[in-house]
Amino acid sequence: MLLFFTLGLLIHFVFFASIFDIYFTSPLVHGMTPQFTPLPPPARRLVLFVADGLRADALYELDENGNSRAPFIRNIIMHEGSWGISHTRVPTESRPGHVALIAGFYEDVSAVAKGWKENPVEFDSLFNESKYTWSWGSPDILPMFAKGASGDHVYTYSYDAKREDFGAQDATKLDTWVFDNVKDFFHHARNNQSLFSKINEEKIVFFLHLLGIDTNGHAHRPSSRDYKHNIKKVDDGVKEIVSMFNHFYGNDGKTTFIFTSDHGMTDWGSHGAGHPSETLTPLVTWGAGIKYPQRVSAQQFDDAFLKEWRLENWKRLDVNQADIAPLMTSLIGVPFPLNSVGILPVDYLNNTDLFKAESMFTNAVQILEQFKVKMTQKKEVTLPFLFTPFKLLSDSKQFNILRKARSYIKHRKFDEVVSLCKELIHLALKGLSYYHTYDRFFLGVNVVIGFVGWISYASLLIIKSHSNLIKGVSKEVKKPSHLLPCSFVAIGILVAFFLLIQACPWTYYVYGLLPLPIWYAVLREFQVIQDLVVSVLTYPLSHFVGYLLAFTLGIEVLVLSFFYRYMLTAGLTAFAAWPFLTRLWTRAKMTSLSWTFFSLLLAVFPLMPVVGRKPDISLVMGAGLLVLLLSLCVVTSLMKRKDSFIKEELLVHLLQVLSTVLSMYVVYSTQSSLLRKQGLPLMNQIISWATLASSLVVPLLSSPVLFQRLFSILLSLMSTYLLLSTGYEALFPLVLSCLMFVWINIEQETLQQSGVCCKQKLTSIQFSYNTDITQFRQLYLDDIRRAFFLVFFLVTAFFGTGNIASINSFDLASVYCFLTVFSPFMMGALMMWKILIPFVLVMCAFEAVQLTTQLSSKSLFLIVLVISDIMALHFFFLVKDYGSWLDIGTSISHYVIVMSMTIFLVFLNGLAQLLTTKKLRLCGKPKSHFM
């Protein structure tokens, strides 16, 4: 069975990885010829301000007194330049946002997982094409463009990473550092002839990355005074820098200024997903080559922002974030970034119609070059009779459009040129997408075949080894035939040869060949399949259809709960009514009432706000007090039992109570310290990490008696969970655990009611007994319900207090007891552990259910695996790459979550077994347990 689980784990890793090969592969191509506009540019230099984490509404709206938070930028909009909204794409993170701005290229979603400093951009950018680029700002952003550039013409000046502290006194210092260093740089340049000559060259870029707004947004939220004050500080800094540039270059009118943001931020201070507050960023441009403000009487937009911002009379020009890169390159006359997919927003340009037409033509040729390279690459690795070209953009059509565009330019029909080039760009982008997804159907079919095969094999294994379903059916053993293995070997050779002649990547061999051994294992059990069919036919059709419908309904409720959290409430409400629909109510009234009460109490959580809630430390304190009260009741009741406690066990419980008290103190004092802007106290940080480290060790010191061990696990994990909580979610594990304790009791009642085995006294059961294989029984129909309950509780543990399908559901304030200095992977790991704590509590309860119902962990675990895999297959079909970016990201993340859950089940099952069965001792004395 160990071999089966090892192979199962490997297969699930392949299925998990498949989504990245099918949907997350980078569309990058190399080998294009650089393209640039053959006319003199309007600007010699460009200054790019990126206010990290700045929302469009936060910049453009007026405050409660009717004044702008950024009066200088507002004045630019009304009197000097052009403005609009830059629409970003998912993931709304700093690296992808800057790549889109500076390279005109949308990285795939997996870019979020890349280390920023150690992973320079692998493609061309504005900085790379410039003669020189000087950049100031965050050490997380600047190095990736400098290291990715060819040559050494990109210079970076960044502060120490420790400055990025969410608990710092004043995050605006990150921005004032940038402004001060830029001023010092230009002051120094006057006395340095070499530097002076460089900054007086043409085709140069100055990049100012301003992180203060993002840091204040994470720490205090965008509605805070700190966030809004930071916008004013940035506005003042931009005003000073613009004045300095104009003075330094003698007001030569050859400087272009671009002010924008990489992404926005949600009301609760996070970003990463596709909410409008994250995807709508400001864009303000002025200076050389930029149109002056255009007064209009009416504008057509689907939103009501213009009226809210009182900018309805100034023409708003919206762009996609990647469009800013070709705008900047055309302004200073450098080649368009080779991998750019941005479309030049000609409405921003203040130049001749000829310049606009030539720039648009260059833009079209540059994107068409990518299409040609992509098509050639795909054609070279596909058999001629299997290759299907992109019909909308044939070679002849490309030639005709380009020829017609040149003819229009010659005859000075510039509007027609712009329109024709936009049409060509849209076709080329469609073609790029077509060839990028060319193999998607082949890969998808193989993954689905493998999935169905695996589910079939796991189901057959359950029926064959762990049930009585085919007992009594004919056991005639047939001599194995060599035809089946030979057939599969032949098919495998054909598939491998087909992939080899097409020069496919090695991963294609994995996806293409994996279904073969799986289906071979299924068809080897043909006798079991026959016996199963015979056995099923003996059951009444109505019973079979009823069970099938109930199972399907249960799966659909689980799937729908990923989209609508209130489905969890509906499911838990149905669970609450379950005892009254059976004989449980008559046999165990108190247990049934407890089950109903805690089911309904837990059902409240999915109805509460997912995110956007303000921190409420009083609820965290309340949860801590409830834990202490419960602990006092349990310890008191156990101490009353004769010989139930020895000193060591009492010491462990007191240690856990002390840990809970310390956690409450740390949460309160950390919150107070951060509000006073005094940062995270070192002692609090030490206590937090010590609590986290001890939470998986202290339970091993407690008694292995079932309820004592489970309660010890709850106390230890709750101490850590309190440190990671900011509001009502601190109550969630407590309510969930209470329901788990009742679940263990009620399952014993159902087992006795069904007459499968006699009821054991729970106070006499020790977790160490679960290694006794002689006590295990065969599976019955009711065990499918138990497995379904587990999956439902696991999904509830995931979605009970938030929608983790979305990156922006994470609140960074959750980790402030552990660290406040920006560290994406450490913070991510802590938040992942916060998600897994309820998961661990459910798995430990499941261990107890298996033990009390005398079931093999393997048999019940197999049913859980089948249910999870059916859900995963469901979500695989729901994955899409069309519609809004929020829909695309959500559909992919749902599949990733279910697959992760299935893989984590194996590891968490092992962790739960370790926590429940392992016993450590403080001293060498022999242990005694109460009966």
Swiss-Prot record:
Q: Which family does the record claim for this protein?
A: Belongs to the PIGG/PIGN/PIGO family. PIGN subfamily.
Q: Which SUPFAM superfamilies match?
A: Alkaline phosphatase-like (SSF53649)
Q: In which pathway does it act?
A: Glycolipid biosynthesis; glycosylphosphatidylinositol-anchor biosynthesis
> What is the designated name of this protein?
GPI ethanolamine phosphate transferase 1
Segments on the Lumenal face: 25-442, 504-508, 565, 613-618, 671-685, 745-786, 846-858, 916-931
User: What disease involvement is noted?
Assistant: Multiple congenital anomalies-hypotonia-seizures syndrome 1: An autosomal recessive disorder characterized by neonatal hypotonia, lack of psychomotor development, seizures, dysmorphic features, and variable congenital anomalies involving the cardiac, urinary, and gastrointestinal systems. Most affected individuals die before 3 years of age.
Spell out which residues lie on the membrane's Cytoplasmic side.
1, 464-482, 530-543, 587-591, 640-649, 707-723, 808-824, 880-894
Q: What does this protein do?
A: Ethanolamine phosphate transferase that catalyzes an ethanolamine phosphate (EtNP) transfer from phosphatidylethanolamine (PE) to the 2-OH position of the first alpha-1,4-linked mannose of the alpha-D-Man-(1->6)-alpha-D-Man-(1->4)-alpha-D-GlcN-(1->6)-(1-radyl,2-acyl-sn-glycero-3-phospho)-2-acyl-inositol (also termed H3) intermediate to generate an alpha-D-Man-(1->6)-2-PEtn-alpha-D-Man-(1->4)-alpha-D-GlcN-(1->6)-(1-radyl,2-acyl-sn-glycero-3-phospho)-2-acyl-inositol and participates in the eighth step of the glycosylphosphatidylinositol-anchor biosynthesis.
